[in-house]
Amino acid sequence: MGSQETTISVGGVAGPVHVKIFPVPDCLFCGIAASEIPATIVSSNPRTIAFRDINPQAPVHILVIPREHHPNLAELAATDDGLLADLVAHAHEVALAEGIADTGYRVVFNTGRHGGQTVDHVHAHVIGGRQMTWPPG
């Protein structure tokens, strides 16, 4: 598929947002979603997939991604808020399945280099299984 273009306004600044639909060449998470790159999948559905983080920061650390390529949280929210809702719902389903929903967990979206985003494909970190501290670091 090609790419779509839409215009959004974030903080009063309008600009084009380019949406590249799955798969994007050289995108690690698109490769995982396409079963081209191995990962420890914990659950999936037609729109999202959840797999264990290769560098866990807690006893439970799972990433939930959309199967479509969206580079970050702001772009996903601006172009497909239904998919964002599905992603968050899947994160909660993962917490339930992993047994951390009752004691508590974090859902974290890192956005941009300074936000700690290392893969330019939006993903939610579901982190739990221990007492979390604040600030997160």
Predicted regions and their residues:
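HIT superfamily nucleotide-processing domains
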Residues: 2-137
